[in-house]
């Protein structure tokens, strides 16, 4: 027998993207709509707080906001319905304020050209996620029909499993070692580890490179304007 060492691959054939803080910024349009939805349902408007909503599902955020105004968690469904409608009514504003981060368009196109399947794992409700992706000009190459969303499952790991299940049902069954979740929060990393896939973190959200480094991600980048380290790792 030889002394060959088998090195685990970090090749990427499937990338599951977070949206807010990772692919694009949307000017807080949906966040404002969230506060307005709670006010509409309960009659009390939440006071904007510096809470950590990053990586949370929209139903979780609705529950937190209801608690903040002393309302019953049973109103979550009502808040989410109001949220969907309010964002639909503000699509013009959303389109005007949404932009992809530097390097995102080129990176997505590069991955698509290499045959990498790309969809999303996000806490956004499905309709709102699609609106944001369309506003950012990211459909295609993102395939939202295979994504996992805040209204797909009760926690983020389950949301990722929904996305992987949808890809599998369409005949795309990658080795878990070739699947990557890319996000901007520790919750994205926890999600990736929970489902047994790789994770890249980018500091285009609210956390710095220093805050993200050391959490255990496979790679941390300041942004996606220079994706060469990522592409090298992904063997693309």
Regions of interest found by a model, annotated:
Residues 156-189:
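Conserved Lys-Pro-Asp/Glu-containing loop-to-beta segment of HAD-superfamily phosphomonoesterases
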Residues 12-19, 23-106, 113:
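N-terminal helical cap/lid subdomain that shapes the substrate entry/recognition surface
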Residues 181-219:
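Acidic, Mg2+-coordinating phosphoryl-transfer loop and its flanking beta/alpha structural elements
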Residues 1-17, 72, 178, 232, ...:
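Non-catalytic pre-domain segments flanking phosphatase-related domains
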Residues 148, 219-225:
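Short acidic-hydrophobic, aromatic-tinged amphipathic segments that line or gate anion-handling sites
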Residues 72, 139-144, 173:
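Conserved H-loop
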Residues 22, 104-136, 146-154:
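Substrate-recognition element of Asp-dependent hydrolases with the DxDx(T/V) motif
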Residues 49-54, 77-81, 140-155:
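A short, structured active-site edge motif that brings together acidic residues
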């Amino acid at each position: 027998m030889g002394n060959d060492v088998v090195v685990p691959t970090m090749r990427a054939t499937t990338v599951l993207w977070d949206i807010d803080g990772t692919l694009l910024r949307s000017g807080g349009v949906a966040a404002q709509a969230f506060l307005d939805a709670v006010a509409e349902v309960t009659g009390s408007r939440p006071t904007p707080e510096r809470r950590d909503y990053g990586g949370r599902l929209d139903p979780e955020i609705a529950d937190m906001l209801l608690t903040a105004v002393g309302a019953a968690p049973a109103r979550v469904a009502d808040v989410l319905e109001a949220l969907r409608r309010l964002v639909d009514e503000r699509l013009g504003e959303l389109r005007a304020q949404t932009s992809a981060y530097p390097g995102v368009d080129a990176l997505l196109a590069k991955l698509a050209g290499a045959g990498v399947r790309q969809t999303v794992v996000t806490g956004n409700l499905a309709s709102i996620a699609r609106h944001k992706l369309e506003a950012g000009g990211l459909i295609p190459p993102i395939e939202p029909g295979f994504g996992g969303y805040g209204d797909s499952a009760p926690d983020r790991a389950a949301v990722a499993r929904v996305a992987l299940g949808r890809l599998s049902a369409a005949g795309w069954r990658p080795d878990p070692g070739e699947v990557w979740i890319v996000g901007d929060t520790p919750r994205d990393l926890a999600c990736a580890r929970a489902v047994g896939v790789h994770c890249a973190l980018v500091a285009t959200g609210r956390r710095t490179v220093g805050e993200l480094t050391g959490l255990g991600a496979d790679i941390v980048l300041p942004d996606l304007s220079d994706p060469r380290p990522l592409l090298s790792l992904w063997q693309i």
